[in-house]
Amino acid sequence: MSIRAKRRKRASPTDLYRTCKQAGTCPPDIIPRVEQNTLADKILKWGSLGVFFGGLGIGTGSGTGGRTGYIPVGSRPTTVVDIGPTPRPPVIIEPVGASEPSIVTLVEDSSIINAGASHPTFTGTGGFEVTTSTVTDPAVLDITPSGTSVQVSSSSFLNPLYTEPAIVEAPQTGEVSGHVLVSTATSGSHGYEEIPMQTFATSGGSGTEPISSTPLPGVRRVAGPRLYSRANQQVQVRDPAFLARPADLVTFDNPVYDPEETIIFQHPDLHEPPDPDFLDIVALHRPALTSRRGTVRFSRLGRRATLRTRSGKQIGARVHFYHDISPIGTEELEMEPLLPPASTDNTDMLYDVYADSDVLQPLLDELPAAPRGSLSLADTAVSATSASTLRGSTTVPLSSGIDVPVYTGPDIEPPNVPGMGPLIPVAPSLPSSVYIFGGDYYLMPSYVLWPKRRKRVHYFFADGFVAA
């Protein structure tokens, strides 16, 4: 007997309408029911065009009789009247102003009426008497002092118990004009000295720079650009315009352009730059000065825009453009010569050669003519300088000709290295057998036969040693 599958209840029309309306997969009876477009709804719509049933409540509603409900014929609906307290008029509360006191007094102050001055009492019967004068000249007052010099005296005192820094001001310079002295009021005595200020360094700013800045709590090291990274392409620029006008190598000159440290280039279409090394360059960052292999190098990092995606993003490699400004010379130490320089003006009689006359005379007779460039002793004069010894010594001055160079300084004798004779090859030695006679012979510890190992047979003498 097969078990019949349980039938699942379909969802409500409202839930089905929410999910299948946008996808367009609704059953044919869902949309008319939810949108009230069934056959019954259409009959009511068409019938209501010619028949009006008023408030009878005939429709597809809940059957409660409409908004007012069912009432008997010939009567009126009851009206619920709510009887409550009589409403009071609102009381306007006036806020207290800033000049009004915060404490309200219960008893008002009595007003004081000032009576004023008393009326004058007249004793005469004719009223006031008017006095007249016949003098018509105006009165002139002489305010000129009798003396010709002006004397000004002042006194000041200092109260140590009271000091007001906000009021104390430096006295201003007085102005004297004729006999009139105009001065400013001072508070106490002040001693000061006017020192002219001198500007040592000026900057080419616009004058709107801030006077001071907030100091940093510590020194922060700014990391330099990684110019020689593997991700950067190294390009050497030989044009010196790269130092001051790098934009001229990417685009042509624009007189309206305002240079900055980081230069951004906008290329709407393909173009040919003045320098082919700067092809597809869209940005050149701030310059940097470095020392590289003994030279001062001016560097800038650039970014290419080789590819452009549909979203407008540019993709390209980073390029390191550099220009070597000047080489850095090696540090040279100032060397001082230990001996004075040679003088070629008078080089005669620089060295004296001493020899015995008995030995020198036979050598001079047998000496052949000296070749060019050698030392000649035949033309020199022989004179005895000492007669105190058995054999007299003769002074022979050294003649310096044009072909014989003469140098001053100590005599240096090179070492006498004897020459090496011919080398005789040694006959190769033949290996010979070594015979050991004895009974004490031990193997090396590494060659000891341990149990559970294969047997080893040693045939060489080097695998063991002889007991002494």
UniProtKB/Swiss-Prot annotation:
UniProt record, GO biological process: microtubule-dependent intracellular transport of viral material towards nucleus; symbiont entry into host cell; viral penetration into host nucleus
Disulfide bonds: C20-C26
Chief localization: virion
An annotated GO cellular component: host cell
Subcellular location: Virion; Host nucleus; Host early endosome; Host Golgi apparatus
Post-translational modification: Highly phosphorylated.
InterPro entries attached to this UniProt entry: Late_L2
Record key words, sorted: Capsid protein, Cytoplasmic inwards viral transport, Disulfide bond, DNA-binding, Host endosome, Host Golgi apparatus, Host nucleus, Host-virus interaction, Late protein, Microtubular inwards viral transport, Phosphoprotein, Viral penetration into host nucleus, Virion, Virus entry into host cell
Location of the motif Nuclear localization signal: 1-11, 449-457
Single GO term (MF): DNA binding
Domain of life: Viruses
Family: Belongs to the papillomaviridae L2 protein family.
Physiological role: Minor protein of the capsid that localizes along the inner surface of the virion, within the central cavities beneath the L1 pentamers. Plays a role in capsid stabilization through interaction with the major capsid protein L1. Once the virion enters the host cell, L2 escorts the genomic DNA into the nucleus by promoting escape from the endosomal compartments and traffic through the host Golgi network.
Subunit composition and interactions: Interacts with major capsid protein L1. Interacts with E2; this interaction inhibits E2 transcriptional activity but not the DNA replication function E2. Interacts with host GADD45GIP1. Interacts with host HSPA8; this interaction is required for L2 nuclear translocation. Interacts with host importins KPNB2 and KPNB3. Forms a complex with importin alpha2-beta1 heterodimers via interaction with the importin alpha2 adapter. Interacts with host DYNLT1; this interaction is essential for virus intracellular transport during entry.
Annotated protein name in UniProt: Minor capsid protein L2
Lineage: Viruses, Monodnaviria, Shotokuvirae, Cossaviricota, Papovaviricetes
Gene name per UniProt: L2
